[in-house]
Amino acid sequence: SHSRLLLFFAGWSASPESFTGLKAENGTDIMLCYDYRDMTFHEDLSSYKEIHLIAWSMGVRMAELALAGKYALTTATAVNGTPRPIDDNFGIPENIFRGTLDNLTAEDMKRFNRRMCGSRDILAQYEKFPARPLEEVKDELQHIYNHCNGQSMTNADDTTSIQWTRAIISSDDHIFPAANQRNYWNGRCPVTEITAPHYPFYLWKQWNEL
């Protein structure tokens, strides 16, 4: 086992196969977290000297809830997400999230993936990965809604257990509005803007390129 860990929290509905193409540097282990129906984090990370967290989309808030401040993170990078993922100013507007939740069909899932990928080419690439069952991702979305909905969201800082060191924002994000991401991150940590859709991982071959 290595002394450096790259810990990745995926977004809603993602299958792990859509990230396995990304390689780690020598001496680095990779751990992928996905499927937020169960938020118990069983792994013991205490043997790692360095933990580099990368969280995408809904994974930003899910990482905060799952890790609950238990580990010192060397770096923490948010990609197209914020700690306030269901929020009219800082996340996905509540009515849009609720609309997705209330009637999620296979057709809606297709539309979601299309918007997430932004172009036919990227979508074709993404659709090669095995999709998770509709009932499962529906259930996951409900759990995410419940996880995010309980807290009083008066002050964003009160609910943040992770010191985020960097945010990456896709300017062409049609899922998690770039303007709302900017609203949240500006003044909180360094921000890198990229020209990409909500799913930007096709841009990179290695995790350290982020």
Residue ranges and their predicted role:
Residues 1-40:
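Conserved HGGG/HGGXW glycine-rich cap/lid loop of the alpha/beta-hydrolase fold
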Residues 21, 163, 176-187, 205:
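Short alpha-helix in the alpha/beta-hydrolase fold that links the catalytic acid
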Residues 54-63:
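Gly/Ala-rich beta-loop-alpha elbow adjacent to hydrolase catalytic centers
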Residues 69-103, 142, 204:
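Flexible "cap/lid" loop of the alpha/beta hydrolase fold
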Residues 85-128:
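Helix-rich cap/lid subdomain of alpha/beta-hydrolase
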Residues 125-154:
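Hydrophobic, aromatic-rich cap/lid helix
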Residues 161, 167-169, 173:
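Short beta-strand/loop motif that positions the catalytic acidic residue
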Residues 175, 191-210:
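Catalytic histidine-centered segment of alpha/beta-hydrolase-like enzymes
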